[in-house]
UniProtKB/Swiss-Prot annotation:
EC category name: oxidoreductase
Catalytic function, reaction form: Mg-protoporphyrin IX 13-monomethyl ester + 3 NADPH + 3 O2 + 2 H(+) = 3,8-divinyl protochlorophyllide a + 3 NADP(+) + 5 H2O
Lineage summary: Bacteria, Bacillati, Cyanobacteriota, Cyanophyceae, Acaryochloridales
UniProt name for this protein: Magnesium-protoporphyrin IX monomethyl ester [oxidative] cyclase 1
InterPro entries assigned to the protein according to its UniProt record, in alphabetical order: AcsF, Ferritin-like_SF, Rr_diiron-bd_dom
Amino acid sequence: MVNTVAKPEFEELRPGIKAPAKETILTPRFYTTDFEAMANMDITENKAELEAILEEFRCDYNRHHFVRDEEFEQSWDHIDGETRRLFIEFLERSCTAEFSGFLLYKELSRRLKDRNPLLAECFALMSRDEARHAGFLNKAMADFNLSLDLGFLTQHRSYTYFEPEFIFYATYLSEKIGYWRYITIYRHLEKHPEHRIYPIFRFFENWCQDENRHGDFFDAVMRAQPQMLDRPRTFWQKIKEIPLSLSGKKWARYFMVCWVPPKLWCRFFLLSVFATMYLNDLQRAKFYTALGLDAREYDREVIAKTNETAGRVFPVILDVDHPEFYQRLERCVENNAKLTEIAKQNGGFLKKLPLYLSNVWQMIKLFLIPAKEPTRVAVR
């Protein structure tokens, strides 16, 4: 008698090559930006710290870390059913996010090479790290008889345009929250090795230090641009920066960057990153259960640590202890579960509309929770 392992069905581009997950508001995004503005960025105010970070990047502490050992050389058919599906999704999302970082950093290094060589080399070395991470994750997917065609992703994924300032806010938070996600899982599994279902988790301690160093780089760049943080433009600086063209794109940038206080953007990106992670992880709570983690407790710890870390550079942080903070996020979790059920039943947009509007309302109310002044202490 032959045992058939319960394996989830995934759409494939061709045998063994998984079709990319459908793009939604919660999936990892690919970014592009104003490369000319990046090249013209003045970093003299914090150049010494950036040069020190560049020296760290050059050391390449993890050059020999991402090497698969004999523990990978086995069948993984015992990871089956829902756990297998969720783990493959975890690997895919992680690989896509790392590859997105590689593409952005590589393009920035190429565009800035002759104009801003210090930043260009930093971006080049960060792209090296991101490529290494993405490749390691894609090889892990292959252990489950699937992998991503990263060239296909490059050509067919839609790219989201962000102003340079927004790139720095978003990537800083992405790297720092990545650090806290990886180190929290690693520390948990060190205490509970019986839940280490796959050897990739053994690599998370050193891996997360790449994320931490990348976050420190973006921290240093923002400190070199204090108008992004706690030194908003003066009225006369705003007048001087009025666009001398009728370009709608330039005028949109002018109003968003010059007239919206940086504290509001910091709050917006903190909330966006935290809400996205919370909604994604609660959709996949069974994956964290397989690791011996409670998804809610895990996310709340990661959010608290990332929020505290962000306070080292951002002028404000979120009040994640406010009683409404998680109440409203939970309402969004409930709404998303209902949206998933409607989609399974091929329900139309009108059925989904009240839930979409409810999610928007919850986000508005979350944004309006008064922010907190950060305590400037290092987080370990």
